[in-house]
Each structure stands twice: as C-alpha cells, then as structure tokens.
Amino acid sequence: MSIQDPRERPPERQQAADQAHAQWKDADSDFAGLVNLWRGFEEQRQALTASPLRNWCRKNFLNYLRLREWRDSHRQLSLICRDLQLSLNKEPADYPKLHKAVLVGLLSQIGQKTEDGDYLGARQRRFWIHPSSGIGKKRPQWLMTAELVETTKLYARMVAKIDADWIEPLA
C-alpha cells in the first residue's frame, strides 16, 4: 500500500511551504512528523466543514485529495483490523512503539553514524540525511530510513532516530 505525501512544495513558494509544514515536524523523527500532520488534519476535519477545510489545506500547502486518500486508507485498515478481531490502541503509541512498528519493515534501511558524520548502512552503503528531514542537524547515532535517493549523494529521506537495542529483537 502506498499513498503520496500530502505536503505540497510548489517551486515558486518553497520557503512558505516549508514554514507551514514546520508546525508538524518532530526533532527526532520524520515518521512522527507525519503522525503530527495526521492529528492536525483530523482536528481540523472535525472542527470545519468541507470548504473551510479545503482552505485550511491550501493555506498549509496540503493536498486535500491526498489527505482524503489517507483517511480512506485509515478507514479500510481499521475495518480489516476489526474483521480480524484485532484491537485498536486505546492510547496513541509512544515514540518507541511507533518506531519499533515501522522498524520491523525497514531493518535493511538502518544506518550507524560514522566519524565523518555520514551513515553506514547495509552492504556498506554510505549515505547522508536529506536536507529536508526534520532531524538533519541532530545526527543521531542510529537511524532508520524509509527511502534512499541518489542525487549528488546518496540521501536518506523520511528518517527517524532509533535505539540500537531495538534492532536485534526485531530482526
């Protein structure tokens, strides 16, 4: 299952978009930043009617239709969980629970910081945190990434700080 990122960054308004999106950033995790965005959207969705919600999305450089796709996928996954008699969390997952759940699917996408400040990943691949990441300047000792993209360098996009002790039990 794949859904496009609802955040928009038009070339002529990149700085304004980055400022609008900054309200959801998390200093340790781009994944948590997406959760923050989801919660912000849900809060607005419950408070506003359709037209003001679309305006809120436009003002915050968010694609309304992609957010509806997020919502539809969430609803479908919730129904599947109910059909399988899986219980949903009563409380939102904390940082370790959220990231361990994601890490299970990204075990080949972890990296350890080197003395040079880049990261060494699987198969001795060296990569850097993409400048768009919310954790770029923090440079955690260990991280996981959802995506490695080659431009001028090999960059990790959508990254999160992880605890090295989480890796072995999940492998």
Predicted regions and their residues:
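Second RecA-like catalytic domain
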Residues: 1-171
